[in-house]
Regions:
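Flexible glycine-/small-residue-enriched beta->alpha junction loops
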Residues: 111-164
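Condensing-enzyme catalytic core mediating Claisen C-C bond formation in acyl metabolism
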Residues: 1-27, 141, 167, 226-228
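Conserved catalytic cysteine-centered active-site region
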Residues: 58-111, 141, 152-157, 226-228
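N-terminal extracellular/periplasmic Venus flytrap/periplasmic-binding protein-like
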Residues: 14-15, 26, 30, 34, ...
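Short, well-ordered amphipathic alpha-helical segments that serve as non-catalytic structural scaffolds
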Residues: 29-45, 68-72, 96-99, 158-165, ...
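Active-site pocket-shaping loop/turn-to-helix segments
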Residues: 14-38, 61, 84-98, 110, ...
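Active-site-proximal alpha-helical scaffold in enzymes
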Residues: 84-118, 166-196
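Short acidic, glycine/serine/threonine-rich loops at helix termini
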Residues: 21-22, 66-67, 122-128
Length: 228
């Protein structure tokens, strides 16, 4: 199947990467994504009235995440759009793009906002009531660390997936090291000439807001926490 949906050149962006418990750890991911989207759309002089659909993806819920895409869109100054909120673990980003493209392809929308966000630092601790449990007590879950540590379908930690793929397809350590070195080389190229490649889709220096989005809490010159 051929898709007619297109991402206009330059109509995409990303924040820098921030390490675990780093410069973004105090921010609400949905509010932060809306804050960034509003600024990036304005910087590109994109009229928000052109949007008639949206798709949001995240894998870690936060307060008021129940309201999903419509809430984020309203915060970003695009209150007229609706759309789904999607969650598919590590495939969430791909699913969001696919969903937005399908909507346009089917003629149900003319311009879609595809947006993803997450904050793995300080993930939620959830309690699931169980009236039939001992004394009426339920079960609990540390959303991020417990799901990283065990995929209930596969019965193994998330980190084990790569090892399983390598074993199944006979990818040896030497080949893996070649890939690591290639990615290292590509990242160094992205940092060349004052991060010229990254600046094609990333606003640098990047001003990190405080939790209330009123003041500048920090400034990032690029990705945080990567060794190269």
């Amino acid at each position: 199947m051929q898709y007619q949906a297109e991402i206009p050149y330059g109509a995409y962006w990303s924040t820098p990467f921030a390490r675990w418990q780093g410069s973004f750890s105090h921010l609400h991911s949905i509010q932060f994504a809306a804050h960034v989207a509003k600024a990036e759309l304005a910087a590109r002089a994109i009229d928000t009235s052109v949007f008639d659909y949206g798709a949001l993806g995240f894998s870690v819920p936060q307060k008021h995440a129940f309201y999903g895409l419509p809430w984020l869109a309203a915060l970003a100054g695009i209150p007229q759009i609706g759309g789904p909120t999607l969650m598919q673990a590590c495939a969430t980003g791909v699913r969001v793009l696919f969903t937005a493209a399908q909507e346009v392809q089917a003629g149900l929308a003319s311009c879609a906002l595809a947006i993803t966000c997450d904050r793995t630092s300080n993930g939620p601790h959830l309690y699931y009531p169980d009236p039939k449990g001992p004394g009426g007590t339920g079960s609990h879950e540390d959303w991020v660390v417990e799901n990283f540590g065990c995929d209930p379908q596969g019965g193994h930690a998330m980190l084990q997936t790569a090892e399983n793929v390598a074993a199944r397809h006979g990818i040896g350590t030497a080949e893996q090291h070649e890939l690591v070195l290639r990615r290292e080389s590509q990242y160094r190229q992205a940092l060349a000439d004052g991060s010229a490649f990254l600046k094609r889709f990333m606003t640098l220096p990047f001003q990190v807001p405080d939790a209330k989005f009123r003041k500048i809490a920090a400034t990032l010159e690029g990705d945080e926490g990567l060794t190269h």
